[in-house]
Amino acid sequence: MSASTSRPAISSPQKEPASTAARFSSARRVAHAGVENLQLISRFSKKGTAQNSAFGVEYKFYDDECHAQVGVRLGNAENVWVRRLTSYHIDVAVSVSGGVRWATVQDVNCLEPVSGTGGERRYSFTNSGGTLVLNQRNYARFTRHGFIVMGNVMGPNVFLADRTDYQFDANEPHLRWSTGGLYDNVKGRIYVQNRWNNGTAHGWSGANYTLYNNEGKFIISQSPLAANYLFGQSDAADRLPFVMAEVDPGNVPNYKACEYSVGRKMTPQSLYLQQLRDRLGPEAVAA
């Protein structure tokens, strides 16, 4: 916004015939508030059990769904946080929904969820509408999509130093066309690909995504319209074939992403922290 004219100022003007600009106000959002230092434990029925296998591991688990599904949900808020929280037997530890920006979720554990393992279950840390959301140093166990961005979510959004164990599926941009995501020093499976007719016909799931110095099995491709990047994946042998290519052989377009230093970590150790240091100095990183 130009200080002299109070009108929007665009640094790189572009002609977009279908675009409009509108004044935006966040006056009614919750701001400068947080949830911290909590342990959330949900009761559940132990009458139902189920078995499933994923990536060569057999699991037996409780299958009750008549209990708490979400630990903390953020919506219509800015400059907010969730930290030092542990949830037990709950599908989603933290859900970020629409109208959220400048949010931090850190040092949160999502443990031993109780539910089925089909669609829309065990999305431990999910972003379905937040922008400028930082997830850092979080942990999920017995998860499906541990660290996930849903469809049409506009970034930038960051997952930093997060970890998943005993996954039924992958950390990933999910559904259709979320943009501007960074997975940085994450330990766990990460898939960025054309999901084709998977789920509810997801198609291209992520655009302008970057994977940086991660560890674990991975898939990465890009659409013809937006680049995705991979830097410093720990082991080239962790690359997997595109999942949906096996469903409809030869008909699922997945174009090679921009890849650098596959099999060898890169310097700096963290892309996000280096950019933070460059912008705000070492004090911001130490904080």
Which residues fall in each region the model found?
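Glycine-rich beta-solenoid repeat tracts in large extracellular/virion proteins
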Residues: R23-R28, K47-Q51, V70-N76, V92-G99, ...
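Short beta-strand-centered aromatic/proline hotspots
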Residues: M1-R7
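Right-handed parallel beta-helix
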Residues: A31-S42, E78-H89, V100-S115, G129-H145, ...
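Catalytic P-loop NTP-binding/switch module of NTPases
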Residues: R7, Q14-A31
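Acidic/polar low-complexity surface segments
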Residues: S12-E16, E36-A68, L111-S124, R195-A201
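Catalytic domains of carbohydrate-active enzymes that cleave complex glycans
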Residues: L160-D162, T179, D184-A287
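A structural detector for beta-sheet-dominated domains
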Residues: R7-A9, I41-R43, G75, S97
